[in-house]
């Protein structure tokens, strides 16, 4: 019998963890009606670096991408810089309902995924399948 012990050092790269996602519907941002997505997430190893939170939108199956008028996936993002090595962010993403690009009279369920990225576009955390009902009347 041979025993082999393998040790691996912890990753020294940046990490993130999404701690809460809250949806607030029918809010006005100026003269634009939409929804706020309130996020709380922690990052580590990101001091002085840019952190980006993005909401990617889908139909109810959470796999069929919701596309804008240009054929790109509907999304909304916000970036900030981490002031500390370990930082907790509270961030609000505003998604104008018009930006969902749904035909007038459409009603049904949609979903969005939240992803946290570093400044190089590396995905640090993701939470999928946040659903909501939308009616475009």
Report residues per predicted region:
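Beta-strand signatures of extracellular beta-sandwich domains
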Residues: 52-58, 115
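Short aromatic-acidic-glycine turn motif
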Residues: 58-70
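Short, solvent-exposed, Trp/other aromatic-anchored flexible loops in extracytoplasmic proteins
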Residues: 72-120
């Amino acid at each position: 019998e041979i025993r082999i012990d393998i040790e691996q050092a912890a990753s020294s790269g940046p990490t993130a963890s999404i701690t809460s996602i809250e949806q607030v519907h029918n809010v006005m941002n100026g003269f634009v009606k939409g929804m706020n997505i309130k996020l709380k997430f922690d990052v580590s190893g990101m001091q002085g670096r840019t952190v980006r939170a993005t909401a990617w939108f889908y139909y109810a199956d959470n796999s069929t991408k919701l596309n804008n008028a240009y054929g790109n996936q509907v999304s909304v993002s916000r970036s900030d810089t981490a002031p500390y090595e370990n930082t907790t962010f509270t961030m609000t993403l505003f998604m104008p309902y018009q930006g969902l690009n749904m035909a007038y009279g459409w009603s049904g369920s949609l979903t969005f995924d939240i992803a946290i990225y570093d400044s190089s576009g590396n995905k640090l955390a993701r939470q999928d399948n946040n659903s909501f009902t939308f009616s475009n009347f």
